[in-house]
Amino acid sequence: MGIQNIPEHELARLREKAKEITGSQFDYQSSYTELLSRRLNGEPLQYIEEYVPFYSIQINVDQRCLIPRPETEYMIEIIKNNISAPKKILDVGTGSGCIALMMKKLFPDSEVHAVDISNDAITLAKENAEINNLEVNFYQSDLLTNVEKLDFDLIVANLPYIPTCNLPTLQKEVIDYEPLIALDGGEDGLLYINKLLDNLKNTDSNDLLLVLEVDTSHAQSLRDSFTDWKDVKLEKDLVERDRYIVARK
């Protein structure tokens, strides 16, 4: 990547970050050069800035987590439109904690739990909870392995859904910097989603709402596989692609 490939708005953000680091509006060139070098090497701007805005909160991000995408942020709207006052919420594959923390902010009276297979991600999510002064129960778990009781009103999941063979086609900055464990969905991209659905065959909830973010190429076939669920529907993302599955059990 050459400097001519970096948009001016990104250069401006790097300058602001350099000023923040140095505490100076003028003597920041050395820091700016270092940050620019990192960006030229392909490091995502969000990791360099160390945070991203997510809906109405701020989330710290680094290589312990996947950078939240607009599709995941829009998932909050999907949830809001489908449930009003869940008492108990579970976020599966929480990563930075962004969805779980927004759930707690939107539904402050709810008990919110969030799990991830990565201990590093859980540590970061706890840091983000402290930064945003929000109380969420974060703990390490391979999907639902360490979840004691499945008595949730709402389960949200944004699990890895990229087929292993497609990983080399991703942008270089994604492959080189973001955690592959948060991207690799196995041979067909459905490994973890199918495991989660299998885990949910028996729940302790009388009225469970499940909201999944999925690959657009999987959406239709996945919806058709929800044979023991009711009110199964697809919801579209910001560019009108089938991106979310909403189902009740």
Predicted regions and their residues:
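Short loop/edge segments at beta-strand edges and connector loops
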Residues: 49, 140-141, 214, 236
